[in-house]
UniProtKB/Swiss-Prot annotation:
The keyword RNA-binding applies. The gene is nip7. It is found in: Nucleus, Nucleolus. Required for proper 34S pre-rRNA processing and 60S ribosome subunit assembly. GO terms for molecular function: RNA binding. GO terms for cellular component: nucleolus. This is 60S ribosome subunit biogenesis protein NIP7 homolog.
Amino acid sequence: MRPLTDEETKAMFEKLSKYIGENIKLLVDRPDGTYCFRLHNDRVYYVSERILKLATNIARDKLVSLGTCFGKFTKTHKFRLHVTALDYLAPYAKYKVWVKPGAEQSFLYGNHVLKSGLGRITENTSQYQGVVVYSMADIPLGFGVAAKSTQECRKLDPMAIVVFHQADVGEYIRHEDTLT
């Protein structure tokens, strides 16, 4: 487990800023302690420094996971967020989308959000902006990328895609063997 390089940190923070903006600093400087990001097997983990010090006694090849996995770097060195980061992204999300109860299941199966399933959307959401998807009961379901801006959504036909699917809580079941 090692600290991220400058290039890796930049790629990860650019991806996180699409979803939570300048609230990234709230992830690192928390009132309950200092947290940091560490890389292990191409996966980025979010862990408190107190637990990180305890993990130094474990051999690197024996360590499977530590803290919360925020995402991983692909072979082309792009950062991809995992659904395990949802609990940390949702409270700080700048742009949100609420889906109707009938569209929740479709989203949780890995499909995009259609206009017919859109309940609400945050004002001034621009196209290709990172959004957190909520149920109408304000339960975070996953995250995605806005396919259309808020103004364009008002004029769309019901079968048009509004949010491109990125990750959802259904992945805990669909990919339980590969999530760490």
